[in-house]
Regions:
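Basic, polyanion-binding surface patches
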Residues: 1-179
Length: 179
């Protein structure tokens, strides 16, 4: 889980707490692929308009502050102030960056694709332009995994016998074995 940051149309900073992504690349380029971004949101409109966004990874201790931005995300609201985040300018794109994040990934928009054609969600692909990582996170896996590292969304598990949906959860990653 991470925060997508963009500028709103009125130049207020936007924070979108998001939980679906993967990252791909080769020797020529690296990409952030975000699934299930709702098309009716200002985050979607901001990315479409400005052709860029930043992905900000924060530890689970910031969870409640990120959720607060969901409840106070009107166009006129400064979502950095709502979440009590420090705003910095991105180095290579026109987007705000959360200074408290241990990793920021600056992306230019490569493609938006409505896979179902229903006009509800889109897959958003960003080409990575720059990555900033705090040194203690860059030097090894000790800080990246565990309570100070990446958050993961654990979707509500469905009971395969009854069809009843379970509650979603937020987890941190614990390395169990090296191979």
């Amino acid at each position: 889980m991470f925060a997508i940051t963009t500028w709103k149309e009125n130049w207020e900073p936007n924070v979108c707490f998001h939980g679906w992504s993967c990252f791909h690349g080769d020797k020529t380029a690296f990409f952030a692929v975000m699934g299930n971004l709702y098309q009716h949101t200002h985050t979607y409109a901001n990315i479409q308009r400005d052709q860029c966004f930043c992905i900000n990874f924060l530890p689970i201790s910031y969870y409640d502050r990120l959720v607060e931005t969901i409840h106070h995300n009107e166009e006129k609201e400064d979502e950095f102030a709502v979440g009590n985040f420090t705003l910095e300018e991105a180095k290579t794109i026109h987007a705000p960056v959360i200074q408290e994040a241990f990793m920021n990934i600056e992306c230019s928009l490569k493609e938006m694709k409505d896979l179902s054609g229903a006009g509800i969600t889109s897959m958003v692909i960003g080409q990575v332009q720059h990555i900033s990582v705090e040194e203690e996170y860059a030097r090894g896996d000790e800080k990246r995994y565990g309570k100070d590292g990446f958050m993961m969304l654990v979707p509500g598990q469905q009971n395969l016998v009854t069809g009843e949906a379970g509650q979603s959860a937020v987890a941190t990653v614990n390395i169990e074995k090296y191979d």
